[in-house]
Amino acid sequence: MAKQSMKARDVKRVKLAEKFYAKRAELKQIISDVNASDEDRWNAVLKLQTLPRDSSPSRQRNRCRQTGRPHGVLRKFGLSRIKVREAAMRGEIPGLKKASW
């Protein structure tokens, strides 16, 4: 089990990313615009740097919903590989069965 503080930190990062999404996209648009003046682009870079670090989507981590495990998380289920296997063996995931060939 992950510490509660680690889970809370990831929740905070998700909220910050949603809050600053529009502003971040607007600044990135200015930075990538070749027709914008160098001064405008430089100011956009400086403004982007002043935004909170945790508002960047790349700082988010997919975690297991049950355990908070950060590695081996299957996006389709939102669970770690271990919990997916346990749930599949109990028959709790419809349509999922053990491979056999």
Curated annotation (Swiss-Prot):
Molecular function terms from GO: rRNA binding; structural constituent of ribosome
Keywords: Ribonucleoprotein, Ribosomal protein, RNA-binding, rRNA-binding
Region forming the signal peptide: none
A biological-process GO annotation: translation
Disulfide bonds: none
PROSITE patterns with a match to the protein in the record: RIBOSOMAL_S14 (PS00527)
Cellular component terms (Gene Ontology): cytoplasm; small ribosomal subunit
Subunit details: Part of the 30S ribosomal subunit. Contacts proteins S3 and S10.
Family: Belongs to the universal ribosomal protein uS14 family.
NCBIfam families, sorted: PRK08881.1 (NF006477)
Chain's role: Binds 16S rRNA, required for the assembly of 30S particles and may also be responsible for determining the conformation of the 16S rRNA at the A site.
Protein name per UniProt: Small ribosomal subunit protein uS14
Upper lineage: Bacteria, Pseudomonadati, Pseudomonadota, Gammaproteobacteria, Pasteurellales
